[in-house]
Amino acid sequence: MAEKLKVELVTPYKKVLTEEVDEITATGALGEFGVLPGHAPFLTSLKIGELSYKKDGVISHLALNWGYFEVENDKVTVLVETAEKADEIDLERAKSALGRAEEALKKLNPEDKSFRVYEAALERALIRVQVAGKSGRR
């Protein structure tokens, strides 16, 4: 059994992360899950949420926007629409997006076609604010 997981996280625009890590946690469609070296192979979908990984005792966080997570032979492949590292998130911009989404949802009926769009925007903004708060910035 390997002592590390080889992780590759990719968006349609760039390779965001290539690391060997001790463990990784993500938010799947059915809830949060964790993977350690030696994990059984599996493939799952990801929802808007947080991905965190531990490397040499240091935990790093990313905000993700929908995608897929695959584990096979101690290699983790993460394919997502977008991914932002905690220290790269513009906290003020994320808070502003959160406020805009909240205001839009207050004005819409849940049956309105754009309600789900703003609901997803709210979820993305909320995750970005939460993850940015874990970056260690002051």
Curated annotation (Swiss-Prot):
Highest taxon of source: Bacteria
Organism: Geotalea daltonii (strain DSM 22248 / JCM 15807 / FRC-32) (Geobacter daltonii)
Function: Produces ATP from ADP in the presence of a proton gradient across the membrane.
Claim: Cell membrane is one of the keywords in the record: yes
A GO molecular-function descriptor: proton-transporting ATP synthase activity, rotational mechanism
Primary location recorded for the protein, binned into one broad class: membrane
Keyword line: ATP synthesis, Cell inner membrane, Cell membrane, CF(1), Hydrogen ion transport, Ion transport, Membrane, Transport
Identification of the protein by name: ATP synthase epsilon chain
Family as reported in the entry's similarity comment: Belongs to the ATPase epsilon chain family.
InterPro entries: ATP_synth_F1_dsu/esu (IPR001469), ATP_synth_F1_dsu/esu_N (IPR020546), ATP_synth_F1_esu_C (IPR020547), ATPsynth_dsu/esu_N (IPR036771)
Subunit structure: F-type ATPases have 2 components, CF(1) - the catalytic core - and CF(0) - the membrane proton channel. CF(1) has five subunits: alpha(3), beta(3), gamma(1), delta(1), epsilon(1). CF(0) has three main subunits: a, b and c.
